[in-house]
Amino acid sequence: MWAYAIKAKKVIATDVSSLHELQKLEKDADWLWIDCFEPNPEEFQLVSELLCIDEKILDDMKMGRAFPRYKKHNDCTLLSISVATIQNELKTYPIYIGVKERLVMTTRKPGSSKPVERTIQTVKDCVEEMEKANPTFVVCEVLRETSNENLEVMMALREVIETVEEEAIARPSRKALTKKVFALKREIAVLYRLLWSEEQMMSSLKDGLIPNLEPCEASVLGLKDAMDNISRELEFLNSYDNALDGILRLQDLGMIHRVEKTLIYLTIVIVAMNLILIAMEIGILDLLLGL
């Protein structure tokens, strides 16, 4: 567990392991950022004691459960943010942020580390120039970096959809293709909900509707830009979903074409059989007349 104490526009990084150390750092610093990477049970207990959160919320954090809006417990505000990744399939990983007076705490997993690590670097690089570097700035930057990370998933998703479209044109009748299409539609639905939830959280933060958080003008502008990007990507997700619907319609047309071909073959066979039967009947009549 690392603590970043900000005092006199300097960042002092310290590895801490006890509540006493954290309380001392908090007392001496202008404000304090505590970052937990894959917290163990002891560190979760420290989080609970420092933020004064109840067991239910702590259990949600341990299990990696996301909550769609902020939670307020005593004088602590808790936020849940999800980071999406896509390799063989879409996966989401949580970041939890707790804010209390001059303290901000983040907990994360390997899959959700990049936004926090980038924000840590931003604070280190810019703390001397920033007039209003505070816990709210950290929350805004983590949100902005998370949205950037999630938007990168869109590019990977688009590439997968293009590959499926090429397969559909080449071999529209493949049953495996239908499974891929429905799997992609599920992933699009998950990503849509995730981005929409982020946009709503940014909007609430921008408008000052989340307790303990008061973004400065620069942070508000950053949030607006991120929200504009998310709105644009949500439109793209709708177009991706429509493209997948087009693939399903193409498969339906292919199935109809196959049925039509089968009916044509059956009709030819039936006509041929009828001709044979007629020929056989004529042959029998000729034999009877000859007799």
Residue locations for each model-derived region?
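Charged, long alpha-helical assembly modules
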Residues: 217-242, 258, 285
